[in-house]
Amino acid sequence: MTEKKNRREKKNPREAKVTFEGLVTEALPNGMFRVRLENDTIILGYISGKIRSSSIRILMGDRVKIEVSRYDSSKGRIIYRLPHKDSKRTEDSKDTEDLKDTKDSKD
């Protein structure tokens, strides 16, 4: 009886996928992107349903985690948008603070 039970167990479909980190190089229509992986391979990535439903914006230059099937390595599903290490917003705010300091010193 246990032998039959073992044969009926389904394999986890996530085992057939490999996760990479990559950089979005081009935005295409309908939630599709060109992504350059860590090994310099460029693949076509599409947004997962969870990212689409939570309205997370993915733009050119964003770092993402992408899930690639072992059977078709030319396409992948974007499952996570990684946070920026060096955000332009923080650099811009520093620049504006420097400008304010120089204006104050002139007065």
Swiss-Prot record:
CC terms in the record's Gene Ontology section: chloroplast; cytosol
Keyword Phosphoprotein among UniProt keywords: no
GO MF annotation, one: ribosome binding
Biased composition (Basic and acidic residues): 83-107
CDD domains assigned: S1_IF1
Top-level lineage group: Eukaryota
Alphabetical keyword list: Chloroplast, Initiation factor, Plastid, Protein biosynthesis, RNA-binding, rRNA-binding
Ranges where the record places region Disordered: 81-107
Location(s), subcellular: Plastid, Chloroplast
Domain S1-like: 8-83
Role played: One of the essential components for the initiation of protein synthesis. Stabilizes the binding of IF-2 and IF-3 on the 30S subunit to which N-formylmethionyl-tRNA(fMet) subsequently binds. Helps modulate mRNA selection, yielding the 30S pre-initiation complex (PIC). Upon addition of the 50S ribosomal subunit IF-1, IF-2 and IF-3 are released leaving the mature 70S translation initiation complex.
Subunit annotation: Component of the 30S ribosomal translation pre-initiation complex which assembles on the 30S ribosome in the order IF-2 and IF-3, IF-1 and N-formylmethionyl-tRNA(fMet); mRNA recruitment can occur at any time during PIC assembly.
Family the UniProt entry places it in: Belongs to the IF-1 family.
PANTHER family in the record: TRANSLATION INITIATION FACTOR IF-1, CHLOROPLASTIC (PTHR33370:SF1)
Designated name of the protein: Translation initiation factor IF-1, chloroplastic
Organism: Sorghum bicolor
Gene behind the chain: infA
